């Protein structure tokens, strides 16, 4: 359908998952194939003119694969990490996506829409040449503990 209308997509790819998958694949051959399939799909998309941009669910960095993923969401938001660690997460995730695209990575969408308070993560994004945010949506609200956001003023 996209080709029919010459339409292009911007896809926000969870780079933290890709990093976790790549790391876990060193101990599980099945995961090598999964990573390779995703990498091929991303290369095909970018070769076709689609755009991939940065999406981060940092809880993947605490999750492990042991006959299935053991998901640890105790550090769900970038805000749950120190400023130095946030900077390395953003840098590593951007580098992961850069491996799959010749186009610049400059936009971000927060995992779980957990962007606030923005000043706490702004410098880490800017240090990595991430200058556009795609997280906020009109009227968005979550009051869930640890996963809160309030975009009602947007």
Model regions: which residues?
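CE4/NodB-like, metal-dependent polysaccharide N-deacetylase domain
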Residues: 3-4, 82-113
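Generic structural signal for well-ordered alpha-helices
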Residues: 38-43, 87-95, 122
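Short, flexible, mixed-charge acidic loops at enzyme active sites
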Residues: 60-72
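Active-site-adjacent pocket scaffolds in enzyme catalytic domains
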Residues: 104-154
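Active-site beta->alpha N-cap acidic-glycine motif
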Residues: 1-48, 109
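A cross-domain feature marking catalytic cores of carbohydrate-active enzymes
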Residues: 11-15, 54-58, 109-112, 134-138
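Short, well-ordered coil/turn segments that N-cap beta-strands
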Residues: 5-9, 47-52, 102-106, 128-130
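Glycine-rich phosphate-binding "P-loop"
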Residues: 72-86
């Amino acid at each position: 359908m996209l080709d029919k209308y010459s339409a292009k997509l911007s896809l926000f790819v969870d780079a933290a998952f890709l990093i976790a998958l790549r790391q876990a694949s060193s101990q599980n051959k099945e995961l090598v194939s999964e990573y390779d399939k995703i990498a091929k799909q991303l290369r095909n998309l970018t070769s076709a003119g689609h755009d991939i941009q940065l999406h981060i669910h940092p809880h993947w960095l605490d999750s492990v694969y042991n006959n299935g993923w053991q998901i640890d969401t105790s550090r769900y938001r970038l805000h749950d990490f120190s400023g130095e660690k946030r900077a390395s997460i953003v840098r590593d995730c951007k580098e992961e996506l850069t491996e799959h695209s010749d186009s610049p990575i400059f936009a971000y969408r927060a995992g779980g829409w957990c962007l606030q308070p923005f000043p706490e993560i702004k410098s880490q994004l800017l240090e990595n040449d991430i200058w556009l945010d795609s997280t906020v949506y009109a009227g968005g609200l979550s009051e869930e503990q640890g996963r809160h956001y309030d975009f009602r003023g947007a």
